[in-house]
Amino acid sequence: MNKTYDFKSIAENFNLEGEIKTSDSHVCGHINDTFIINCEGENGEEIKYVLQKVNSDIFKNPEQLMENIENVTSHIKNKIIEENGDPLRETLNIVKTKEGKSFYKCKEENYWRIFNFIHGASTYQIVEKPEHLYTAGKALGKFQKQLSDFNVDMLYDTIPDFHNTEKRFEAFMKAVREDRKGRAKDVKEEIDFVINRAEDTKVLVNMIKENKLPLRVTHNDTKFNNIMIDDETGEGIAVIDLDTVMPGLSLYDFGDSIRSGATTALEDEVDLSKVNFDLNLYEHFAKGFLESAGDAFTKDEIEYLPFAAKLMTFECGMRFLMDYLNGDVYFKIHRENHNLDRARNQFKLVSDMEKEMDNMKKIVYSYI
């Protein structure tokens, strides 16, 4: 993060408890800038908040985005209260501005928001033990089940065609043809990897068109590090980063969780010998996910869960490679060839999944 901000003047527009003391940058995620605001309460206690600058270059209508988050978290809170849970820890809680809004728009046209900090819980960039993935699966399954009676029509489509893999492929081919930075000649193998799987990009899109898959309220970005894990119990307690909550497929959420969770390395690991799809981790997540929400899904949704894991991993790799070809304009990079490294990493996982697809299917059907 190259730019510095006057955090105190920004945060003072929100209804915070205590006196603002310090702020720390929180370097995590590819899209928004995130910071931790530390306040001191009346009795000297530490109160933390999460401050974020919404990336309005990507999220073209932050007002609609925040309305989605507000509606979804309000619905989830009601469910948590019905279940005698803790609504302050089990979902995101928006801190309103002094004008009663869910965001603050400063004079530089930046959009800022604040959430309560969830204490006693952590996120993990990589799975440290299989039990974490089982409990993450339970948390995501619970998230989908809690929203199963939410009216999808109430949600804005904040990023149209976000997981439309057919259109993603068309955009990828456009990037190859334009070759803005002259990089295509050096990544022919990776480009061919994508082209050889073009038919895969049509499968779920066609099923939606044929009304074979129901649209649900979905998270659409269920990386493992978007699940808060309780530090004491090891249970998955909350699903966070709700910017892409909109109508979608349950398959998207399952698939992206496997992409980020059932791997032996970070998504930008350069040494591909360290990057492997872990079938045991896949099974732990599938077990938790289906235990929590399996009875809410249709036969076709269940059948295509394994394929969705491969497709979401493929889509992510394709997007990384497209961004590399376009000159690294979407995902934040921290080194040369960062997006290319990410793409190769994801394609290695896709290859592994293709070899394990029969076993992946057997695992799903063993838990329904």
Predicted segment positions?
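Juxta-kinase regulatory segment immediately upstream of eukaryotic protein kinase catalytic domains
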Residues: 1-24
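Short, surface-exposed acidic
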Residues: 17-22, 183, 296-305
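Conserved ATP-binding subdomain of kinase catalytic cores across diverse folds
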Residues: 23-25, 30-40, 46-171, 250, ...
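ATP-dependent phospho-/nucleotidyl transfer catalytic cores
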Residues: 24-28, 52-53, 59-63, 121-136, ...
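Short, low-complexity Ser/Thr-rich regulatory SLiMs
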Residues: 38-41, 229-231
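Active-site Asp-x-Gly
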Residues: 229-294, 334-339
